[in-house]
């Protein structure tokens, strides 16, 4: 069986950045915003009393990256895929000021990865792989890979089904979808061509 190149996003797919971001803003400014209040990509809309600078400044602190933790099932599923021999690449869009603390923390949380398996880009469609798992519809549309949208409150308004994108809710579902993809797409093609 051919091994896959699996691309996956970091923030709000592998780890809980949005939760930590909201928590830090609530602590700093006495607000009471919840994850469900963030209904789109513009975090400032969930914090209308704060300036854009106040909302985004916390991302440039080391503290936020120390707080992030893996989303449920992420480490286990990614470790399993790694053990099965698939190539894993964490593909993330990051401000240059956050790269080092962010990547250092991600490598702590996902010790089976190293720097060679972290790709930092704002244009994920330029990265080649078999599968991309992301919470940003804009990262999936137009890419040349099997597309999995990781469900988060900020992407609920996106109609994934109408664009041929698979919306999934847990890492366990993602693992099952990848196994199904291997069997139905790759296995059938290998049988046909005799690979």
Regions found by a protein language model. Give the residues of each.
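Acidic, Mg2+-coordinating phosphoryl-transfer loop and its flanking beta/alpha structural elements
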Residues: 135-170
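Structural recognition of alpha->loop->beta junctions
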Residues: 105-121, 163-179
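Active-site neighborhood of HAD-like aspartate-dependent phosphohydrolases
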Residues: 1-54
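Short, basic/glycine-rich phosphate-binding loops at helix/coil junctions
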Residues: 46-61, 85-88
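A short acidic, often aromatic-flanked loop/helix-cap motif at beta-alpha or helix-coil junctions
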Residues: 41, 123-129, 155-157, 171-177
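Substrate-recognition element of Asp-dependent hydrolases with the DxDx(T/V) motif
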Residues: 65, 69, 74-106
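Conserved Lys-Pro-Asp/Glu-containing loop-to-beta segment of HAD-superfamily phosphomonoesterases
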Residues: 119-144
């Amino acid at each position: 069986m051919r091994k896959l190149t699996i691309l996956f996003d970091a923030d709000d797919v592998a780890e809980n950045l949005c939760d930590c971001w909201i928590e830090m803003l609530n602590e700093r400014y006495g607000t009471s915003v919840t994850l469900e209040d963030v209904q789109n990509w513009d975090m400032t809309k969930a914090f209308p009393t704060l300036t854009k600078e106040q909302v985004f400044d916390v991302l440039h602190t080391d503290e936020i990256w120390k707080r992030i933790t893996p989303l449920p099932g992420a480490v286990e599923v990614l470790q399993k895929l790694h053990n099965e021999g698939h190539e894993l690449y964490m593909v993330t869009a990051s401000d240059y000021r956050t790269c080092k603390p962010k990547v250092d923390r991600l490598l702590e949380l996902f010790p089976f990865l190293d720097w060679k398996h972290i790709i930092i880009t704002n244009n994920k469609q330029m990265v080649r792989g078999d599968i991309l798992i992301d919470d940003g519809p804009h990262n999936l549309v137009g890419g040349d890979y099997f597309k999995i949208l990781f469900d988060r409150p900020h992407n609920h308004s996106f109609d994934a089904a109408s664009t041929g994108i698979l919306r999934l809710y847990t890492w366990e579902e993602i693992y099952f979808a990848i196994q199904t993809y291997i069997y139905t797409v790759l296995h059938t093609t290998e049988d046909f061509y005799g690979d």
